Amino acid sequence: GALGAAAAMAGDLADSVLLSFEPGSYPASTGISDPIQIQELAGGFVELGSTDVAVFGANGAKLRTIQPSYARPAIAVGNTRFALYNRAGTELRIESRTGTLYTTRTDAGILLCAMSPNGTTAVVTEHNRYAAAVQVLDPGFSVIYQWYATQSDGTPVALGFASDNRRFAAGCISAVDGQVSSRIFLMDCGADDPVALYEADAGSLILHLYWLDSQHVLAVLSDCAVLLDASTGAETARYDYGGASLVDVDTAGSGVALLLTGGGDASLILLD
């Protein structure tokens, strides 16, 4: 783990030095007419379209274009790297700003991926005996953690890593008595079992998970946003949408912005 992280950091530093000499400027034309995802990548950004992936440097220079030929492509970003995968497919690629670092095929269809700041990657796949399997790869692509979510645990639909690259939150959904049930598991790659558990109100669907700092996880659900203690899973604060619908959410440090719509109006809610 430590060796893989050190090698990754050395490679990222070498990339940064080389890329600083690439000419570029803004506004930048990406060449992608049907963007699906746009994520910040080490000061630049990566843009995913239905057929192409474009990587740009901090100065607007176009660094590379990838054509993965996936039916349902998705990306997950971690500072200078990103995971490129085919949802419901089995191919996973770890990409840097300058090239492909790692390619593998999973035993079952990929449901979701997430990446920590140092390139640690969590991969959620289908499983024939469990709701899903979660496997965590370190920056050197060795498996360091596995978790099998039972049917009562639910299927992971949201993941979020802490800045220590070791802890993560997994938001899982299942059906209970005809309603959606959301459970949030607080995990540590050094522990065999989940560290803590939070169960949302019946009918509340987990959408996003963010670590605001080392001890607080923001869980964004379909009807509210809750702040959780990362050690105990206890709810420490809550904001209910009051019947409005969530359009978007953003975090900056410990601040949170929620964009809500309802009754023909839009509201921007700032939380601290």
Each PLM stretch: what is its role?
Residues 1-33:
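Sequence/structural signature of beta-propeller modules
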Residues 172-272:
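Extracytoplasmic/luminal low-complexity segments enriched in Pro/Gly and acidic/polar residues
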Residues 31-38, 69-80, 108-117, 153-160, ...:
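Repeated scaffold domains used in trafficking and secretory/extracellular systems
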Residues 57-59, 96-99, 137-142, 189-192, ...:
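Short loop/turn segments that connect beta-strands within beta-propeller blades
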Residues 62-171, 178:
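Non-cytosolic head/periplasmic domains of membrane-anchored proteins
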Residues 17-30, 60-67, 99-105, 143-149, ...:
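A short beta-strand motif characteristic of beta-propeller blades
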Residues 55, 84, 93-94, 135-136, ...:
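Conserved blade-register residue in beta-propeller folds
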Residues 36-48, 54, 75-87, 92-93, ...:
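Short beta-strand elements that form the blades of beta-propeller/WD-repeat-like
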